């Protein structure tokens, strides 16, 4: 892209010199997008033109507890004000991890909230995953919960989790079935055999330093990647650990989100931008290339290859197939985008779901909808 190359520690770092981008998409689709996002200010949804011709009735809401620590002016029609994690299980149910309202399950007919009365004592959920037996695992700031469809079981210090504050995207079930848990004080692995015998079933993964883990993922080759807020990125191939940090030409030691594109490249978010790693070369994109905001933390790559990046103050849509500077489209508060995006998820049908500080949004590839308890859940 007309950049310049620097060599550090045997690794090539590419930095772009493209001038800042001020361009915004001026299509009808963008106008629709920005108008809908303005509904974060408390307006009703449905400023996208026509709503679905035959919307399905809203689901039955099942909630047997009073939400904790919610603002007096909290909009009770929202699925929840803060949605920190989103996941779709093997049965197609969508799960939403919230702050102060536990976890909610949507199965097309009901929206069910689970909290203290159900044995799910903690109300803030930062990570969700499913194991090979169909159990759901939830990461909270009070340890891990396993849900077998009937009963919640909590794991904490007594089970070997010396640190019980689970990271965002801090639960991974790898291809072999091993369950990894990232905390703010290291990474742990779960031993189901020890659990069945009533012993300590979580043990510290000692091949890693005691990192402040910001996320765990498995790539297409079966390597496990760990993002940290203080030591860069680590890759584990089943035998050895490789650390990619400042000394290896990563521009900083902070890494937040991780994703892998269709070509096998790894992408990392950092405080000052995002970085693509092809196994040899690190290519960095910053505000000079068109990224908006500061302190980049979330990243997801759609099945189509479109990359979404969340940051403090903005969200950026990045199309790698388009030459810079036109590859980036930034949405900020100036565009009416006042919602702080806290989670992004693409379901099996390809629809994109956005958890924000002002509720839930759905993006079907063409339009954005704010999804409240009564919908619209489907387009």
Locations of the language-model features?
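Carboxylate-rich, polar loop motifs that coordinate divalent cations or form catalytic acidic clusters
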Residues: 1-379
């Amino acid at each position: 892209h007309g950049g310049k190359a620097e060599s550090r520690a045997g690794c090539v770092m590419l930095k772009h010199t493209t001038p800042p981008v001020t361009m915004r998409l001026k299509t009808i689709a963008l106008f629709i997008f920005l108008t809908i996002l303005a509904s974060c200010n408390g307006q009703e949804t449905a400023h996208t033109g026509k709503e679905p011709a035959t919307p399905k009735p809203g689901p039955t809401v099942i909630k047997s507890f009073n939400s904790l620590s919610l603002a007096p002016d909290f909009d009770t029609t929202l699925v929840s004000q803060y949605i920190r994690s989103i996941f779709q299980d093997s049965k197609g149910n969508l799960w939403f991890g919230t702050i102060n309202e536990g976890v909610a399950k949507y199965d097309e007919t009901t929206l069910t909230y689970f909290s203290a009365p159900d044995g799910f004592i903690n109300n803030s959920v930062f990570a969700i995953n499913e194991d090979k037996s169909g159990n759901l695992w939830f990461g909270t700031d009070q340890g891990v919960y396993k849900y077998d469809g009937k009963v919640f079981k909590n794991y904490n210090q007594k089970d070997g989790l010396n640190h019980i504050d689970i990271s965002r995207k801090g639960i991974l079930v790898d291809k072999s079935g091993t369950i990894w848990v990232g905390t703010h004080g290291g990474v742990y692995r779960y031993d189901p055999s020890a659990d069945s015998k009533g012993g300590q079933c979580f043990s510290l993964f000692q091949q890693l330093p005691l990192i402040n883990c910001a996320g765990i993922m498995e790539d297409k080759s079966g390597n496990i990647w760990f993002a940290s807020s203080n030591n860069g990125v680590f890759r584990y191939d089943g035998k050895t650990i490789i650390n990619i940090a400042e000394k290896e030409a990563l521009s900083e030691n902070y890494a937040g989100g991780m994703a892998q594109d269709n070509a096998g490249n790894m992408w990392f978010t950092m405080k000052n931008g995002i970085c693509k790693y092809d196994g040899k070369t690190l290519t960095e994109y910053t505000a000079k290339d068109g990224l908006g905001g500061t302190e980049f933390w979330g990243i997801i790559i759609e099945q189509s290859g479109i990359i979404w990046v969340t940051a403090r103050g903005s969200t950026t849509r990045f199309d790698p197939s388009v030459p810079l500077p036109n590859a980036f489209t930034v949405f900020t508060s100036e565009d009416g985008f006042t919602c702080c995006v806290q989670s992004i998820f693409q379901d099996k049908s390809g629809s994109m779901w956005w958890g924000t500080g002002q509720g839930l949004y759905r993006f079907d590839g063409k339009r954005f909808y704010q999804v409240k308890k009564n919908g619209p859940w489907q387009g």
